[in-house]
Amino acid sequence: VPAAINSYINYTKAYALFAIKVFCNATQPQTEGAMRPITIKAREGSFFNPKFPAPSGGRAILQIRIFDTINGAMSKALPKKAMGAFSHWSNPNIGGIDDKTSKPFVMYDLSLAGYGGRYGEDGPEALTPVMNCTNIPVEVHETHNPIRVKCLELLPDTGGAGQWRGGCG
């Protein structure tokens, strides 16, 4: 696609393997032998295997979408291992000119939200989706940017209803 959200095949394979591993044995070491039985293919020139120089910058967004797609498909065969969809991304990007220094600034953060519920338990709250990152503490933003955070809290009832609800964010 013309937007910077294409998933080159190396990312498509990595994200798909992650999703499949969650269903098989998430604690098994990530080795070539463990992944060898899995084949991942995508038509060349497609969204999941674009031709260079197709733009691809939104890889974090893709990871969650690919995971949710495979999770949804696998849930038909293994419903007790599946989970509800992630909250996806809503990252604030704030920028401008600092009134005190007259210098430009850009502030970026990860908005933490809930994971989907799964068989037997509610989804966890206020986590980043599946990629080993975290938000930047409020104190860091306030120290390095001309902003003031008035409130940072979990919003009740935002995780989606169900026997096992999604986590709030």
Regions found by a protein language model. Name each.
Residues 1-168:
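Glycine/proline-enriched, intrinsically flexible loops and inter-domain linkers
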